[in-house]
């Protein structure tokens, strides 16, 4: 699979080449997955943040994402999140805390590059049947060869 775009930066870079697995695979929180998005008309790569029954809270004021009250930490996320509209322009709103109750049988996904990612904050929940597989190995560039996490 070819990574196209910056939405998973710093974890994955544009033009990285990955191997995915899909045999007997069920998406889990923290996994990096390849998704066939009908809403976007393309394949996207995102991290699973929540699964069915989870409550995901995206708090732009405190720069946090929580799942069931527990803050998700990721060392690859280096910049503060800002809220955007559909045209990727920054804007201010009174309420900068958004709560998502993930329905059973659905996934909530986000790009690691939170400020440049079209993900569940916009396209909402993902059906696990749209997940093509989990990214497990980076093949290229050769100097970044190794396990994807």
Residue ranges and their predicted role:
Residues 1-8:
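Aromatic-capped interface at the extracytoplasmic side
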Residues 10-149:
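Soluble "head" domains of membrane/secretory-pathway proteins
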């Amino acid at each position: 699979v070819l990574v196209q775009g910056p939405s998973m930066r710093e974890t994955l870079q544009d033009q990285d080449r990955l191997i995915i697995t899909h045999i007997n695979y069920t998406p889990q929180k923290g996994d990096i997955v390849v998704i066939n998005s009908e809403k976007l008309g393309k394949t996207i790569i995102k991290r699973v943040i929540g699964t069915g029954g989870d409550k995901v809270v995206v708090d732009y004021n405190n720069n946090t994402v929580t799942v069931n009250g527990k803050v998700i930490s990721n060392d690859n996320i280096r910049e503060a999140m800002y809220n955007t509209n559909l045209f990727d322009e920054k804007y201010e709103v009174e309420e900068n805390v958004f709560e998502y109750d993930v329905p059973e049988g659905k996934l909530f996904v986000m790009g690691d590059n939170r400020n440049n990612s079209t993900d569940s904050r916009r396209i909402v929940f993902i059906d696990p049947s749209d997940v093509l597989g989990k990214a497990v190995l980076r093949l290229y560039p050769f100097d970044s060869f190794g396990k994807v996490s």
